[in-house]
Amino acid sequence: MFTLKKIRVALIGYGRSGRNIHRKLLLQLPDKYEFVAFVEQDKERREMIERENGVQALNDYRELFGRTDIDLVINASFSFDHARISYDLLANGFDVLSEKPASGNVNDFECALKAAKEHGRQYFIFQQYRFAPAYMKMREIVASGKLGRPVQYTFNFDGFARRWDWQTVHGFSAGSLRNTGPHPMDWALDVMGHPQDIDVFCAMDRAHTYGDGEDYVKMILRAPGAPVCDIEISSAFGFGGKDTYQVHGTRGCLTGTDNGLKWKYYVDEEAPEQHLTTTPLRTEDCTPIYCGEELPMHEEEWIPNAEEARTFNSKGLNYYNALYDTLTTGAPFLIKNDEILLQLKITEEAYRQNADMFK
């Protein structure tokens, strides 16, 4: 009987991401991953680790150095430590999966990339939203050509909520652009084709956060030959109606959320033939009129199945299944680090445009 190779995992950080996301996901893939070490600075959390996992928890990630029973280290430390700790791990011979944001700045991420290259290690960033079922379905629909050429994508992450934890503090590499932004930014750059010549507009504000970081972000990305991308992250809008996914196309459009998508489009062969008219439009009795036609529109929808509907879970499992293939067979991983680097450059430009907020 064929037995899958298990990836032996060390997890740094046992908080909301480490315990509630990464541990929860990997416990659902027991044939592919197993935990062999945990690292947590908080004493009470270390006791929790030992109760819940039966594994002794370490206080310092440097206690992992020299061990040969670890295939992958998941770095779910504080955001401001992601790049520094990843660099140390890579330089000491470990393959690393880091939580987002990959870094608080471009320079530190480039240092980590250099360490990975110099030491022959693999370095991944947890951008699991690329694997969200609704996002992948949206990409499939656009690729079919039914909507024509996409003119604009809009990605909305809106809600109405106050926040007062450490992830509201700008100096902790936090705020909405770094906390939430990596997900819609990853989508936007993906649909744009990751152009290097990209124009960035970004407006930020503080609505009711208790820290000095932003909790409102409006970002517009443009590049030659690419669709416009409109990203909105707001903690100040509590009404529905602003779907997560929107596509404006030359022959149709799409809208929806993780709970379902709907799209409509017309087929060229079914559309009434029209020609440009430069004289004023009128009826036979000379009454002025607007353009008007009966344009047959086809409407379709997609509803996720039971597993796809558990989006928070399914996109993470999709990510870890793809990562497993990369680690065990050498299959190319979908998300490349030069894509993450581009995202960080745009993030730096966004903060530069709003520097007065953080003086």
Please give the residue ranges for each predicted region:
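Contiguous beta-strand/loop segments that form the cofactor/metal-binding neighborhood of enzyme cores
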Residues: N179, M185-E270, L317-P332, T347-E349
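Hydrophobic residues in well-ordered beta-strands that form the structural core
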Residues: N59, N75, S98, Y123-I125, ...
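Charged, glycine/proline-rich intrinsically disordered loops and linkers
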Residues: V267-E307
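Rossmann-fold dehydrogenase core element
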Residues: C111-Q128, R149-Y153
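Beta-loop-alpha module in the N-terminal Rossmann-like domain of NAD(P)-dependent dehydrogenases
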Residues: V55-A115, K315-N318
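Predominantly a Rossmann-like dinucleotide-binding segment in NAD(P)-dependent oxidoreductases
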Residues: Y129-Y210
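N-terminal Rossmann-like dinucleotide-binding module
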Residues: M1-N53
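C-terminal helix-rich "cap/oligomerization" subdomain common to oxidoreductases
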Residues: M1-L4, L11, L72-I74, E294, ...
